[in-house]
Amino acid sequence: MKITQLTVYPVKSLQGIDVSQSEIHAHGLAWDRRWMLVDAQQRFVTQRQLPALATISVALTSDALVLSHPTVEPISISLEEPKGNLRLVSVWSDHCKALPESEAVSEWLEAALGEPAKGVSLVRFATTFTRAVEDDFLAGGEAHTYFADGYPFLITTTGSLDALNNALVAGGNTPVPMNRFRPNIVVDCDEAWQEDGWATIESGSYQLTLRKPCQRCKITTVDQQTGTIPTQAEPLKTLLALNTQPHLKGAHFGQNATLTAGEGGVIRVGEVVSVTPREA
């Protein structure tokens, strides 16, 4: 099996960046979910509240994070950490320390997205702070992440997407691209749902341990280029019907993972990976 896609999401819930290789760290791929949008109460803001966030594209240069939108000029944000007081921001039930970006970024967001983005600001994860991953599925180990929903890596497979799309078409619906699921790592795999039986995935330089199925939310219904919802409730409705995790409630697609060997290594598109099966 080979890795066919690597995607980094520097800003939570904005567009991702497809890369050919990336450094791999305990907190995720390099720069993944380092930034996040928050409201006036310092609570995280995502496509769940603002689907139009999907219309903001992201680039990384050697010294800047660049945000672009069709209606406004791009804005560049220095990769150097901003000066200023730390804020306490929330992601689900976690409280994290973060550095606020400039007011100019907030003004840019409102100009790009209009009234719904009023009061929204951009913050950067403070690397002096550690956000622990829930320990329920870590088998006694430890892991941490930045502003991801819960885990530093999300792994999906081409075989599972093919199976989902076959089911969508059979139900009279339109197939969806992989970006609906916002994975970090996509593995080429002929058979559907094989990832649900993997314990680890590794190459010579790193090992990822698959911890739990990823329960999906309504962001999967949002077109990741236009910010619109083409077909109400899909692909969630079809995923629920497929019931790929009969022992769990909800719709699931992909596996959450943590790094268990190879901190600081490099992961590459095209490299062959091996898997070990989960114990029955």
Q: What is each model feature region?
A:
Residues 1-280:
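Metal-cofactor-dependent catalytic cores
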